Amino acid sequence: AILKLLQDTSICDYLDIGTGTGRLLELLGPRVKNATGIDLSHEMLNMARTALEKSALENCQVRLGDMYDLPFEAASQDVVTLHQVLHYADDPASVIAEAARVTRQGGRLIVIDFAPHEEEGLRQDHAHRRLGFGDEDLATWFKQAAMQANAPVTLTGDPLSVVLWSGTKS
């Protein structure tokens, strides 16, 4: 779904916030000039480095970084993704604002996360702070961050559905 969303987008600089195992870097890396994944977990960064080495993606790198204080200049990225990360945030609006800060004019910010759900076990077992997000929440946060929201794409699942919310920097 993300490849389809970006099929007509030229990407020089790509940032994956909360990269985890680096899966999106592996997926988008062949299409971009420079890709960086950041994460607060040294363990996840090591897993991502290993995956990128196996994939021989020399244009991709990973580094330690905080989603609330990204180590990048303003307007430095063509595409920024938050893949299954926002539900860990205490302040999702601030994360969106910081991601938008580093997105270039005309660039894309893509949030991939759960639709609203009732799976309370994810709080205890996986430290989720939020049980999904509504379209209205993301639209509001995008607007506050000077992003023009695009129509969300829902991937229906049972019991969890995932939504791709995207915005273009105005």
Which residues are covered by each model-predicted region?
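Conserved alpha-helix/loop element of class I SAM-dependent methyltransferases that forms part
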Residues: 1-12
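Class I SAM-dependent methyltransferase SAM/SAH-binding core
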Residues: 13-69
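A short acidic, Gly/Pro-enriched loop at the edge of an enzyme's catalytic core
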Residues: 68-79
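A short SAM/SAH-binding and catalytic strip from SAM-dependent methyltransferases
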Residues: 78-91
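Short N-terminal helix/helix-N-cap motif within the alpha/beta-hydrolase-1
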Residues: 90-93, 119
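A short glycine-rich, Lys/Arg-flanked "PGG" loop and its adjoining helix->strand segment in the class I
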Residues: 93-108
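C-terminal alpha-helical "lid/dimerization" subdomain adjacent to the S-adenosyl-L-methionine
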Residues: 108-165
